C-alpha cells in the first residue's frame, strides 16, 4: 500500500510539473435554458469587458465564450449548450483568486451596465454545469477562428496518444494547416475530474469558418506515409468518444 501511495504521489507530481511548464486550461460546460439570446448578450456585451480587463492586467492569459453547434433547430437533447474555455500559465494561477475575474464586474461595468446585466440575467437559468481541467501538452496557435472542434477520448495508452500527437501530427499540421483554414490545434491531458465516465485526453481543431471545419471532417485525407507510422489504433482503439463543434461568441482578446 505504501508503494502504491508513493507511486500515486509521483505520478501526480509529474502531471503538476508538466502543467506548470506548458500551462493549463479549464473547460466549463453549461446547460442554459430560457432566453439564451439574453445570456449571450450578457457574456458578449458586458462580461467580455470584464474578461478583457483581466487579461490586460495579466490576471489571466485568455478566456473564450463559445456556443455549441447542434446542426438542428430543436434543442431537445438537454445537453450542454455553452462552454467557457480559460487558459492559465500554471496550477497556481488556476487556483488564484485572480482567476475568478467575473467577481470584478462591479469595478469594470457602470451602474447602468450592471442594471442591464441583472435584467437580462433574469430571463434565463443555468440548469447544469461541469468544469474540467487539462494540461496543455502541446499546441499550435496561429490565430483565433470562428469555429472549433473538441475531440474527447479515453485512450488505453494516454502517454502514447499524446506523444504521437506531438511527434507525428503536430509537425504535419504546422506545415499544412494554412491550406485548410485551420488556425489553432492542440492536445491536452485531463487533470480533473478523473473517473470511468470522463475523457482522459482532449484535442482541438479550430478553423476560420464552419465550412472549412466540415470539409476537414468529411473530405480531408491524411497522408499514407504518416498513417503507416501511426500507432493510434493501439493507443486509442475505441476512437473518440465525442467530437463537438462550438462557435466563438466572445473572447478576452477582442
Predicted regions and their residues:
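Bacterial Sec-dependent N-terminal signal peptides
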Residues: 1-22
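Short S/T/G/P-rich N-terminal loop/turn motif that feeds into the first structured element of a domain
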Residues: 19-108, 115-254
Amino acid at each position: 500500500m505504501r508503494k502504491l501511495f508513493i507511486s500515486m504521489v509521483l505520478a501526480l507530481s509529474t502531471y503538476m510539473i508538466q502543467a506548470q511548464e506548458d500551462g493549463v486550461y479549464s473547460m466549463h460546460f453549461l446547460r442554459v435554458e430560457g432566453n439564451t439570446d439574453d445570456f449571450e448578450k450578457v457574456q458578449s456585451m458586458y462580461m467580455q469587458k470584464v474578461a478583457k480587463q483581466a487579461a490586460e492586467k495579466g490576471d489571466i492569459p485568455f478566456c473564450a465564450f463559445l456556443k455549441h453547434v447542434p446542426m438542428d433547430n430543436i434543442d431537445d437533447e438537454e445537453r450542454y449548450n455553452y462552454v467557457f474555455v480559460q487558459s492559465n500559465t500554471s496550477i497556481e494561477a488556476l487556483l488564484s483568486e485572480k482567476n475568478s475575474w467575473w467577481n470584478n464586474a462591479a469595478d469594470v461595468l457602470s451602474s447602468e451596465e450592471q442594471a442591464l446585466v441583472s435584467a437580462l440575467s433574469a430571463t434565463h437559468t443555468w440548469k447544469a454545469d461541469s468544469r474540467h481541467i487539462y494540461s496543455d501538452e502541446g499546441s499550435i496557435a496561429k490565430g483565433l477562428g470562428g469555429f472549433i472542434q473538441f475531440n474527447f477520448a479515453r485512450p488505453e495508452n494516454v502517454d502514447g496518444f499524446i506523444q504521437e500527437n506531438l511527434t507525428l501530427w503536430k509537425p504535419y499540421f504546422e506545415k499544412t494547416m494554412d491550406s485548410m483554414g485551420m488556425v489553432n490545434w492542440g492536445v491536452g491531458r485531463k487533470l480533473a475530474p478523473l473517473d470511468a465516465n470522463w475523457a482522459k485526453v482532449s484535442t482541438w481543431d479550430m478553423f476560420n469558418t464552419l465550412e472549412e471545419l466540415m470539409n476537414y471532417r468529411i473530405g480531408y485525407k491524411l497522408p499514407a506515409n504518416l498513417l503507416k507510422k501511426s500507432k493510434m489504433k493501439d493507443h486509442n482503439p475505441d476512437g473518440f468518444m465525442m467530437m463537438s463543434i462550438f462557435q466563438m461568441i466572445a473572447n478576452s482578446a477582442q
